[in-house]
Amino acid sequence: MATIRIHDEQNTSIENQEEVEQFLKRQEVIYEKWDITKLPAGLKEKYDLTDEEKQEILDVFAAEIKDISERRGYKASDVISLSDQNPKLDELLKNFKQEHHHTDDEVRFIVSGHGIFAIEGKDGTFFDVLLNPGDLISVPENTRHYFTLQEDRKVVAVRIFVTTEGWVPIYEKENVNQS
């Protein structure tokens, strides 16, 4: 279940599932909970994935991917795995933590591990969405955001795209978020 942490003076947290869903809906962020128990035991918490294992993950969630793709016009998907096993993890995270936006939605379904999307809210205040296995999020097009990992520094996620080329980040600021 996802939780919210608002970057306000009170550092407000939202943990109740219904309140999380309502908050994200007001921000026009799509949030869904997919059945993670469908994932075969051999793929749970596995971060060094072969191409065949990545395809198996896509196959397991093919119906869900097809459903959201038909509703939203998405055309492609893949699986990304980030962990300390990747020697370039710190470099990747530095790039991910730069505020950016896209001209299409950024969609992630968390298969294993954890991730955080920091998203600029409608009022200009950023909020974090702390994601866990089974959580799907779609950050709307032209919404400033960045992604990072939680303390465990590992995630496997299905990425879903509007085009077969994937997405291209548009950076407007030079700074890199370090918080």
Swiss-Prot record:
One of its GO terms (molecular function) is acireductone dioxygenase (Ni2+-requiring) activity. Fe(2+) binds at residues 100, 102, 106, 145. The record marks 108 as: Important to generate the dianion. This is Acireductone dioxygenase. Its EC number is 1.13.11.54, 1.13.11.53. InterPro entries: ARD, ARD_bac, RmlC-like_jellyroll, RmlC_Cupin_sf. It is an enzyme of class 1 (oxidoreductase). Its cofactor is Fe(2+); Ni(2+). Binds 1 Fe(2+) cation per monomer. The lineage of its organism: Bacteria, Bacillati, Bacillota, Bacilli, Bacillales. The keyword Metal-binding applies. Monomer. Gene3D superfamilies: Jelly Rolls. SUPFAM superfamilies: RmlC-like cupins. Keywords: Amino-acid biosynthesis, Dioxygenase, Iron, Metal-binding, Methionine biosynthesis, Nickel, Oxidoreductase. Pathway: Amino-acid biosynthesis; L-methionine biosynthesis via salvage pathway; L-methionine from S-methyl-5-thio-alpha-D-ribose 1-phosphate: step 5/6. It comes from the Bacteria. The keyword Lipid metabolism does not apply. The record marks 105 as: May play a role in transmitting local conformational changes. Belongs to the acireductone dioxygenase (ARD) family. Pfam families: ARD.
